[in-house]
Amino acid sequence: MERQCEALVIGAGPAGLAVGACLRRCGVPFQIVEQAGTIGASWRQHYDRLHLHTDRGHSALPWLDFPKGTPRYPSRDQVIAYLDQYAEHFGIVPHLGQLVERVQLRAGQWITTSGTSVYRSKHVIVATGYNAVPHRPDWPGREIFGRRLLHSSEYRNGKAFRGQDVLVAGLGNSGGEIAIDLCEHGARVALAVRSALNVIPREILGLPVLALSIALSRLPPRLADALAAPLIRLIVGDISTLGLRKLPVGPITQIETTSKVPLIDIGTLRLVREGRIAVLGGVRALGHGGDVTFDDGSVRRFDAIVLATGYRPGLEKFLEPGLCAMSGTPGQDGLYFCGFRISPTGMLRGIGVEARWIANDIVSKGRPQ
C-alpha cells in the first residue's frame, strides 16, 4: 500500500504526539507511524514506581496542560493517561504496528518503507526517542553468571526480589529510583557506580529545580552552575562522604557538553546515608554463582543485577549513516529530529519547543518566496 502525505512523523510517543499537535495547529497534513500497538509505548513499559522527575507545570506538551488535580510529579500511569488524552484532544490517530525499515531521499521526496506500506512525503520528522535500544555492558563472564541479569527496561517492581541481594549497575535517574523501589520491597541493595556524577535536589526552597534551571538557562552554563552551586551543596551535601565522586563541572555544563543529565535525587542519598543502600565501584567481571568482581578487585555475590546502564537511539536501523548524526542544519532536505536533545530545561519541555519550531519551519518553507 502506498500513502502520500505532506509530513510523516515516525514515533507516537511524547515527541511524535507533540509534533502532530503542532502540525495540526498549523494546518499541515501529516501522518504518524508507530511500531508498537499503542501510543506512548515506552511509557507503558516503564517500571511501576516511575514518576516524572520534572514537575507537571514544566512537563506538559504544547497546547494542553495536565488535568487539574494531577500531582506536581505525575506517576507513570498519569503520564500515560495524559498522552491518551492528548492524542484524542488533537484527533491524532497513528498507524500502529508499523515498523519503519528504511527512510531514503529520492528525487527530492522522502520514501519511508514499513512492511508492505510505502509513505511518500515532503518532510520526515523522526521522533522515536533517545531511549530506544537498551545498552547492556559486555562484561566478561556474563555467560557463567548463573543469576538473574535484566535491563532496567525489563524491570517492573521489586516484589520478586524481596530478601535478595540485588546490584543496581548505574546511578542515573532510573538507577536511583529502582534502588529505592528495591529497598521498599525488602531487597538488600547495592549500587555499582564507576563514573563521577552531579546530584541535584528535585526541589529547592519548595520550588521544582527545573524552575531554577529555566531561570538560569539564559546565562553561560559555567556562570549558571556557579550561582546554583551553594544552594545545591547545602541541600545535597558532600557526596564524597557516601563513596561517590562529583564531576568537576556543574550540572548545567554537564548537560550542555556531554548530553548526560545529573541525578535528580528523590530519596536515594537518604537511603545511602542510612546504610540501606551500599555504594560500590564499577563492575570488572562476572563469575560463577552470582559472583561480581569490582574495579578494586573485591568480589561480592548477588542474586540479581539490574542494568540501569542507559539506552541508545538505534536510528541506524532505518536511516542511512549520513542521516543518523542528528546534527547539521535542522530541517535540511525536509528531515527533522524531535526529542533527541538533552536540555537543562527539561526533556518534555524541550520537546514542546522543538515541535513548535519544526511545525513553523515546515509552514515557512511552504510559503512562496
Regions inferred by a protein language model and the residue ranges of each:
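Flavin (primarily FAD) cofactor-binding/catalytic cores of flavoenzymes
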Residues: 2-36, 40-42, 71-173, 177-207, ...
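A short acidic, helix-capping loop that chelates divalent metal ions and anchors anionic groups
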Residues: 65-71
